[in-house]
Amino acid sequence: MAKIIDGKAIAAKIRGEITAEVAKLASKGVTPGLAVVLVGEDPASKVYVSMKEKACKDVGIFSDEYKLPVDTSEADLLLLIHKLNSDPKIHGILIQLPLPKQIDTEKVLEAISPEKDADGFHPYNVGRLVIGKPLFQPCTPYGVMVMLKEAGVELAGKEVVVVGRSNIVGKPVAFMCLQQNATVTLCHSKTRDLAAKVGMADVVIAAVGQPEMIKGAWIKEGAVVIDVGVNRVGEKKLVGDVEFDAAAERASAITPVPGGVGPMTITMLLYNTLEAAKRR
């Protein structure tokens, strides 16, 4: 039976370290500040924003929330970002996605100052990530890499298979693994014989957003499985992208859903905000 990689425990440890660092900065008169911008009334987005606010409060980071109506124009949102870019109290800016259809998401993300890009989505930061000199790393992939390190998983020389090619998780985590000298295969909806690709992996990172799409029988004996997916099945049940019980029979280590990668995402957002404040 696989060892469970406990995201809650790892996140709690890192948040403890962040709290100490924030206190150290505060003693020098600097309080890290995060601006969170929510446009509209999307229920999931509202939950995420309140979780981020609470997390900031818990570690001593100042958070400023901007709730804008769903019919906010792109020009008005860009004006707010411009204001936040020049606000010395704000070290990190987070735009809660998705944005309403009248707003060009790429244009908005590009308007954020790269030095305040706490989510790590600005093209400048993506480019730096690709060449191995990141300023900020996207929070979920960063969380995955920290979990692998904390679990004692050495990536150099290993076969890593990433399933899912999103700009938010799949692509950045593939580049991060490459920087750790892994041999990386990036799979997606057009990949032929996905089962065979997954079956050769020493480490599987699933980030496709399809409930239990990765079958336990595909997992190589002794592989490490990181499940980024969070999918609601029915009213209450949450499952990942991997068939957990069957995969846990074959893997050496696996992340659960919930309680795996999820807690790490907000933790790395806090870390990025702290780092931004340190650089000022």
UniProtKB/Swiss-Prot annotation:
Its EC number is 1.5.1.5, 3.5.4.9. Pfam families: THF_DHG_CYH (PF00763), THF_DHG_CYH_C (PF02882). Belongs to the tetrahydrofolate dehydrogenase/cyclohydrolase family. One of its GO terms (biological process) is methionine biosynthetic process. GO terms for cellular component: cytosol. This is Bifunctional protein FolD. Catalyzes the oxidation of 5,10-methylenetetrahydrofolate to 5,10-methenyltetrahydrofolate and then the hydrolysis of 5,10-methenyltetrahydrofolate to 10-formyltetrahydrofolate. Homodimer. Keywords: Amino-acid biosynthesis, Histidine biosynthesis, Hydrolase, Methionine biosynthesis, Multifunctional enzyme, NADP, One-carbon metabolism, Oxidoreductase, Purine biosynthesis. NCBIfam families: PRK10792.1, PRK14186.1, PRK14188.1. It catalyses: (6R)-5,10-methylene-5,6,7,8-tetrahydrofolate + NADP(+) = (6R)-5,10-methenyltetrahydrofolate + NADPH; (6R)-5,10-methenyltetrahydrofolate + H2O = (6R)-10-formyltetrahydrofolate + H(+). NADP(+) binds at G164, R165, S166, S189, V230. InterPro entries: Aminoacid_DH-like_N_sf, NAD(P)-bd_dom_sf, THF_DH/CycHdrlase, THF_DH/CycHdrlase_cat_dom, THF_DH/CycHdrlase_CS, THF_DH/CycHdrlase_NAD-bd_dom. One of its GO terms (molecular function) is methylenetetrahydrofolate dehydrogenase (NADP+) activity. Pathway: One-carbon metabolism; tetrahydrofolate interconversion. Signal peptide: none annotated. The gene is folD.
